[in-house]
Regions:
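Residues on the lipid-exposed face of transmembrane beta-strands in outer-membrane beta-barrel proteins
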Residues: 1, 87-93, 167-171, 255-261, ...
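Surface-exposed loop/interface segments of Gram-negative outer-membrane beta-barrel transport/assembly proteins
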Residues: 2-84, 102-104, 108-249, 278-284, ...
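Short, solvent-exposed loop/edge-beta patches enriched in aromatic
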Residues: 90-100, 177
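Conserved catalytic-core segments centered on acid/base and nucleophilic motifs
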Residues: 91-95, 255-271, 276-284
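Extended, hydrophobic alpha-helical segments in both membrane/secreted and soluble proteins
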Residues: 103, 251-257, 265-273, 288-297, ...
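An active-site-proximal beta-strand-loop segment
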Residues: 242-246, 254-259
């Protein structure tokens, strides 16, 4: 009897500025990141400078509505932490000659947590505050912004776990010199769980002081729209917690039998049944039965072919059967998704 145990633990911390390839590609070759005096140059890939100058910028929460990629890099702090833990256990034991028992167990757990912080100096934060400011285009009167001044913190976490448990019997034997038989049969049980949470955005966030502010009119709901600075209907981003949970369970029964005579002629049969927690009122729809039969002729070992020098290997094989996978992306029943939101006033 032999046994083995393997454990794996990984952790990866990553910190980036969140600058995308798109931001680089939108930067014209002639544009500078810094002026000669060391101040930030205005990059033109977001708003037209001439149009901005027509607005009463001095009345807005942020009179500086310009974008600069270097300023974004310095003002962002995007952190991601990924952890993975895996345990694998194996056991193999011989029962009688040619017959052995094989057991495999694996458990794996992973998590991914992110915190994206855009400081008050970033265009992302300043643009949100200004864009969500009440504005009368005719009188150029500026009202209250629905988002408080300060940085923006976005965070969330995804957790994934699974286990796989397999029991299998293997049989291999040869007898009477010309007969070979191999067979296996087993059962495999598995479960996959995924849980994800996206937290509400934290507005007016100051990383150094660890303080934040609540929007003056509350977060509202995901359908509570209003007119933003540009006169378009808008809702406050990240006002609600998003939560998801999924559990997939599977069980499989399988067998495979092969027979070879004189090393030339072979036959095989395999069958498998895959079941899952598929949403259905008909239990038969939760199972996917599959099978196949096959035959093989090793022509290369026949006497009439051995004298042909340019043929050193030749097999003729034929199989027939039904194959596939458990389908869980749809259902014969009407599925309902339920969500909720909080309307803060």
């Amino acid at each position: 009897m032999t046994a083995n145990l393997i454990t794996t633990l990984q952790r990866k911390d990553q910190e980036t500025s969140g600058v995308t390839i798109g931001e680089f590609s939108n930067l014209s070759p002639y544009e500078m990141l810094l002026n000669e005096d060391g101040s930030y140059a205005t990059n033109l890939n977001v708003y037209n400078r001439a149009e901005l100058e027509k607005l009463p910028l001095e009345k807005l929460p942020y009179s500086d509505w310009s974008y600069n990629m270097l300023r974004e890099v310095r003002g962002r702090e995007y952190k991601t932490t990924n952890t993975m833990y895996r345990v694998q256990l194996g056991l193999n034991a011989q029962i009688i000659k040619g017959l052995n028992y094989d057991m495999r167990v694996q458990y794996e757990s992973t998590s991914s947590e992110y915190k994206n912080y855009d400081s008050e100096d970033t265009f992302y934060a300043r643009n949100l505050v200004n864009s969500y400011t009440e504005y009368n285009n005719e009188t150029q009167e500026v009202g209250v912004s629905r988002i408080p001044k300060g940085g923006v913190l976005r965070s969330g976490k995804t957790e994934y776990s699974n286990y796989v448990f397999r029991n299998q019997l293997n049989y291999n034997n040869s007898f009477a010199e010309k007969h070979e038989i191999s067979a296996l049969a087993g059962i495999e049980i598995s479960q996959y769980d995924t849980e994800g949470t996206v937290n509400p955005y934290v507005y007016g966030y100051n990383k150094e002081k660890n303080t934040s502010s609540v929007p003056p009119y509350g977060y509202g709901s995901n359908v509570d729209s209003f007119k933003n600075f540009f006169g378009n209907s808008a809702t406050i981003e990240g006002g609600n917690t998003s939560y998801s949970l999924r559990c997939d369970r599977y069980v499989s029964y399988y067998t495979n039998i092969g027979y070879v005579y004189d090393g030339k002629y072979g036959a095989s049969f395999s069958a498998r049944g895959d079941g899952s927690n598929f949403v259905s009122d008909d239990p038969s729809l939760r199972w996917s039965p599959m099978w196949s039969v096959g035959a093989k002729w090793n022509i290369g070992k026949e006497e009439f072919i051995k004298d042909i020098d340019w043929i050193n290997y030749l097999n003729l094989r034929a199989t027939y059967g039904i194959n596939g996978n458990a389908e869980k992306s749809t259902s014969p029943l009407t599925l309902v998704s339920v969500g909720s939101s909080v309307n803060s006033t």
